[in-house]
Amino acid sequence: KKLGIAVVMSLHELDLAMKVSDRIACVDGTCISKIGTPEEIFSGDYVQKLYGIEQETFHPLTGEIFLRSKKEFPKVFVIGGAGVGLPVYYRLQREETPFAAGILFENDVEMGAARALASQVISVPAFHPMDEKALEGAKKVLDQCERAICPLQEFGPLNEANRALRDYARAKGILCEDN
C-alpha cells in the first residue's frame, strides 16, 4: 500500500488468504463469483457453499480446513482445552482412531477441530464453569472408551472438572500417562 503497488496472488490456502489479503476474488469454475474483504468472504457459509464442503470441516474465524473423520464409537477420550489437545486430535485422525473430546468451552480454540474430527464432543457454554452435568456426561462417554489421554498440564477454577475427569480415568486404569 505504501508503495502504491498492487499484488495479485492465487491462493488455495484459505487461512493464508484471510491473513494477507485486503480484497479477495472468489472464482467459481471460470467466473469470479464474489469480491470482498476477508471479513465479507469468510463470514457466514459462503466459502462452504463455494467449495461444497461441510459446515464442520471449515472454521470461518480461522480459515482452518479439517479433513473429515469417521464418526464411529470413540475408543479414546481426549481431555483437552486451550489448544493442547490439537496435536492429539490430529494424530488420532491420522491413525484412524475414533475419539471423544472434552470437556471443552464452546469458544475454545480446539472446538473447530473437535467438532470436525471427534466422534463426540462434551462442551459447556463459553465463560461458564464446567458443571457436574458436563462431568457426569463426560464420565459416561469415558466409561465406554479403551483409553484416555490428558495433555492438559494446568487446571484452574473453571476447568477443575477436567482434573476430576483425568483422575477418574487414572483410577480406572485407562489414562495414558505419556500421551
Please tell me what each predicted stretch does.
Residues Y51-E132, C150-P151, G156-N159, E177-D178:
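ABC ATPase nucleotide-binding domains
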Residues E160-L175:
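A short, gly/pro- and small-residue-rich
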Residues L11-H12:
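H-loop/switch region of ABC-family ATPase nucleotide-binding domains
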Residues A17-K19:
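A short, surface-exposed alpha-helical micro-motif characterized by mixed small hydrophobic
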Residues A25, G29-E40:
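Conserved switch/coupling elements of ABC/ABC-like ATPase nucleotide-binding domains
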